[in-house]
Amino acid sequence: MITALIMAGGEGTRFWPLSRKDHPKQFLKLNDNQKTMLQETVERINELVPLEQVFIATNEAYQKAIKKQLDGIPEENIIVEPMKRNTAACIGLSSVVIEDKYTGSTMIVLPADHLIKDHKRFVDILRKSIMTAATGKNLVTIGIEPTHPETGYGYIHFGDQLHTIDGDQVFEVRNFTEKPDLSTAKEFLEEGTYLWNSGMFIWQLSSILANIETHLPEMYESLDRIKNALGTDLAQKVIRDEFEKMQSVSIDYGIMEKADDIFVIPGSFGWDDLGSWPALERVKKVDADGNVVIGKHYGIDTTNSIIHSPNKVVTTIGLDDVVIVDTEDAILICDKKRAQEVKEIRNILEAEGLEDCL
């Protein structure tokens, strides 16, 4: 039995001001096929996992949007996190809920807001990851073969080759590294033993729960109490009370950096996490001046820029390497090279109490 967990609770802060708290990145149509990121994520795995075996982890505010976008998904398959507790708690809670319904299944864990161009190749890598996860109590992740020195991603350092599956290599993981500076990213690329950390995982439910018990024992105790309450009138109260106690830690730091038997399968299938505005250059048409324009733009000597203004005419003179995003109540203008800092400017607005703009 194969199940899937789609993590769809994030706010997509680096895509502000288009991505908002009440309508974040996973609900946006950033590709040219008029489907949201969430819809694309679910559709690309449908030949492996039928909709009734797909679970969505999110927060209460996004329940209605998910039901609307994923017509036919069972309501009980929408797992609501009572509050923010990072990915380890999210995956832990979801694992207990899924194990209760599909005992003994293998679970695919995917972010809701990534772009994948080569669906066939992606599904092929997933199949091989599932086969690898079934061979023991190992935890499997998919690493992306880097194409350039990227500072916006974490990296996976892989070691010895363990085996191959129909031509695809499976490696042991030596360690996970945080987002590097540019010089370190260049070293990683030259060394050839580093992959981008995609945040995609495949494992048996029993394996991830055993690792939570070993490495996050207090969280496991809370999960065990939740497990015992499922199906009772007290279930929602117990979930809220126990989830609140859980440590806020990422699955990478809490489990993957500490566990034994971590395997990685390199993949190259047109992956992009669309982590910030410059990513649109990789998925949208770029004009003769190197600009990505969504809306109406008239410019003089304006090059290599991203301009998103579907409702207003934007005019520019003498600009290069900038991002301009116009929405009804907020405008972003920034140096394209500093687009990763959009999250920080958003934090400033939050500190100033400008909740309506978030």
Regions found by a protein language model. Give the residues of each.
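Short coil/turn connectors at secondary-structure junctions
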Residues: M1-I2, L51-E52, P74-E75, Y102-S105, ...
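Conserved N-terminal catalytic core of the sugar/cofactor nucleotidyltransferase
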Residues: M1-I6, R14-K21, D32-P111, L115-R127, ...
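Residue-level signal for inorganic ion chemistry
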Residues: L38, S94, D113, I156, ...
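A short acidic, often aromatic-flanked loop/helix-cap motif at beta-alpha or helix-coil junctions
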Residues: K84-A89, H148-E150, L182-T184, W271-D272
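A residue-level structural signature of the nucleotidyltransferase/glycosyltransferase Rossmann-like core
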Residues: M107, T193, M200-F201, D272, ...
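Conserved core of the sugar-phosphate nucleotidyltransferase
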Residues: H119-R240, F263, K336
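Left-handed beta-helix
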Residues: L205-L358
